[in-house]
Each structure stands twice: as C-alpha cells, then as structure tokens.
Design a protein with these regions (language model features):
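Short, charged/polar surface micro-motifs in flexible loops or helix N-caps
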Residues: 19-24, 33-34, 46-47, 76-81, ...
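Conserved Nudix-box catalytic region and its N-terminal flanking loop in Nudix hydrolases
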Residues: 24-65
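Short connector loops at helix/strand junctions that flank enzyme active sites
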Residues: 11, 33, 40, 89-93, ...
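A short coil-to-beta-strand element that immediately follows conserved catalytic motifs
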Residues: 66-76
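Nudix hydrolase/Nudix homology domain
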Residues: 35-38, 104-167
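Short Gly/Pro-enriched turn/cap motifs at secondary-structure boundaries
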Residues: 4-8, 86-87, 115
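Active-site-adjacent beta-strand/loop module that shapes the phosphate/pyrophosphate-binding cleft
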Residues: 79-110, 124
Length: 167
C-alpha cells in the first residue's frame, strides 16, 4: 500500500541555475551507490531558513560564491525517493537563476572532505551542447531534461511562473 502524499517526509531544497552568456552551466557531480548524477549547486534548507537564505548559504559552501545576484524562481522539481540516511522520503527543489557573467573557478568554503561526505565530488562548467550530447547511459542529469530546460531559459527567458521540470 502506498503512503498518502501528506504522510511523506519531503525535504525542502533550493538550487542555483548559473548560466554564463556563452552558455556554460555550473554543475556538481554527486556519487550515489547506484549512479553518478550531475546536478545544479544547492541543497536542503536548515531549520528556520528561507529558500533565498539557504541558496546564499549553499552557494558559499559548495561554490565559494559570496553575494550572488539571485534572480527569478524558474523551476520546481519534486521526486519521491528515499534518501540514503532514511530521514526523508523525497525532495522538493526550487531552482533560481543566479547571475554568472563569466566562468569562474569554484572555491568552496567547505573542505573537499566535507563535500564528499555529502556525496559531492566535483564542480564543473558544462557547455549546453555538452549536456545535449551526453547521451550515454552513465551520464545522468538532474533534472533529467536539464539541457531542454536550460535551452528554454536561454531562448525564451525566465518563465512567468515556475515550471515543473519533471524528474
């Protein structure tokens, strides 16, 4: 029997969509027991934090970006999958555009030991074309249609209301 959605423990999280004018996107590589996933920088809200406070904290911790220019809330994503620590049944992500006038070398405030403890193993700028061409079974992006959604942001600009990205 499936649990009703209201009984699920859903972690609130936030992610940054950093896109340069030449269409590079900053991604983080997470290593999970079953696969590697490239995602956008960010993470869960701490107790009492707003989404924007959490985004700013996560950008300092993971990327070393202080005083980011945060723009529009562009996407939402909810996925129901138990977290490895057993505390959560799923996660609800809010994605915000963050100004990136050029590529920079990420300098996380957290040590690589601390980041690896959170399963984060690499930060890398990907060109949009690279994301589109990464079709092998071992390269997973989160959200799955990341290239499509980024291309829509570049072509059409931010949506009037946040778009559901699917898984």
């Amino acid at each position: 029997m499936t649990e009703p959605a209201s009984a699920l423990r859903i972690r609130q999280a936030v992610r940054a969509v950093l896109i340069t004018p030449d269409h590079h996107i900053l991604l983080v590589r997470f290593e999970f027991p079953t696969r590697t996933v490239w995602s956008l920088p960010g993470g869960g809200l701490d107790p009492g934090e707003t989404h924007l406070q959490a985004l700013r904290r996560e950008l300092i911790e993971e990327v070393g970006l202080h005083d980011p220019v945060v723009g529009t809330h562009v996407w939402n994503r909810e996925h129901i999958i138990p977290h490895l620590d057993g505390r959560w049944d799923g996660q609800r992500d809010r994605y915000y555009l963050v100004s990136a006038s050029e590529r920079f070398v990420p300098a996380p405030a957290l040590s690589w030991e601390q980041l690896r403890a959170e399963r984060l193993h690499e930060l890398r700028w990907w060109h949009l074309d690279e994301i589109d061409q990464a079709t092998d079974a071992d390269t997973w992006f989160s959200p799955r249609a990341l290239g499509h959604h980024v291309r829509a942001l570049i072509t059409d600009g931010p949506p009037v209301a946040p778009i559901d990205t699917g898984i």
